């Protein structure tokens, strides 16, 4: 369902990440050419690579109502698997995995594609009338991505793309960590704020029931 007040996860957080790229020094051609030299931060190296045009990876508003989902964990370590629970009325679709970054101003780079289990209509989400909580943890896993041990940490998203002859796509954001790395810079996402404004099911911490807003929200709901 769509409501007048909506919250789009990649604004403004991703704009900050894309502009900064988490690599502060030099942005010119010479800097990009040296970004993958020995002893250079792997994030600077990754962000110097060619990206995917925004027109290819972006979606309009909340994305397609026929493809909505969330990750079972908002954050995974390299080498772990991120699972996606997706409610879909599309007869076929694919899951493209992107990493956010500078990438020559493109904002994201396609990492890989994952084939989902197939069309999957999920059951109604669980709800709690006294608090307004909407929790879709009862959905089944639809697709998974084993994160390579060589993956570069950052904000990623799964782009759900219809392949049944009808256009439509949606995003599922998640974070890839590298718990073995060391850095003088730490980036913290605003994921608790994302969920506070998430109105999937009709409620958020600012609108809905039982008293004009919910008292509890869940990460287990459409992003």
Regions found by a protein language model. Give the residues of each.
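Secretory targeting and sorting signals
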Residues: 2-32
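Ligand-binding face of N-terminal immunoglobulin V-set domains in extracellular IgSF glycoproteins
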Residues: 67-173
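Proline/serine/threonine-rich low-complexity linkers at boundaries of modular beta-sandwich domains
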Residues: 34-66
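Aromatic-Pro/Gly-enriched surface loop or interdomain linker
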Residues: 88-93, 97-101, 108, 113-114, ...
């Amino acid at each position: 369902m769509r409501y007048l007040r909506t919250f789009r996860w990649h604004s403004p957080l991703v704009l900050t990440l894309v502009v900064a790229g988490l690599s502060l020094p030099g942005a010119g051609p010479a800097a990009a050419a040296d970004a993958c030299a020995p002893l250079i931060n792997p994030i600077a190296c990754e962000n110097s690579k060619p990206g995917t045009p925004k027109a290819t990876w972006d979606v309009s508003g909340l994305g397609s109502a026929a493809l909505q989902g969330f990750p079972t964990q908002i954050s995974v370590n390299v080498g772990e698997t991120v699972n996606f629970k997706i409610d879909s009325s599309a007869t076929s679709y694919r899951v493209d995995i992107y990493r956010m970054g500078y990438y020559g101003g493109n904002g994201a780079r396609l990492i890989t594609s994952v084939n989902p289990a197939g069309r999957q209509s999920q059951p109604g989400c669980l709800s709690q009338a006294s608090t307004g909580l909407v929790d879709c943890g009862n959905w089944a896993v639809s697709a998974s991505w084993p994160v390579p041990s060589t993956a570069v940490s950052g904000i990623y998203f799964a782009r759900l793309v219809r392949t049944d002859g009808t256009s439509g796509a949606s995003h599922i954001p998640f974070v890839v960590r590298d718990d073995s790395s060391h850095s003088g810079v730490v980036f913290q996402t605003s994921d608790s704020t994302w969920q506070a404004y998430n109105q999937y099911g009709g409620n958020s911490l600012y609108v809905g029931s039982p008293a004009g807003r919910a008292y509890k929200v869940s990460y287990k709901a459409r992003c």
